Amino acid sequence: MSISGITNTALSGMRAQTMRIGAIANNVANSSTPDYARLNTSLTAAASGGVQATVSPTASDVDPATELTDLIEAEQANKANAVVFETGADMWEMLMSIKRD
């Protein structure tokens, strides 16, 4: 995989987790709204590499413990993707400095 492929994969992961965090925020904000359908985020492998997020309503009720657990998981995944992106960017900078020398 190329360095740009690494960074693009990490970026797609961060975008997907951002969508997931948005769905969680909606669930918590609307937990007491009558007839609110909880939003669920499904993550799948994208054809071009990386991750694709799909948000869809579900029939289940909002459970604060589940939302908190999902939020922690999404934050950790976002941090991991940020580290991968940073590593790819560092590798790119190193290659460019070698090329200049």
Residue locations for each model-derived region?
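Amphipathic alpha-helical polymerization modules
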Residues: 1-101
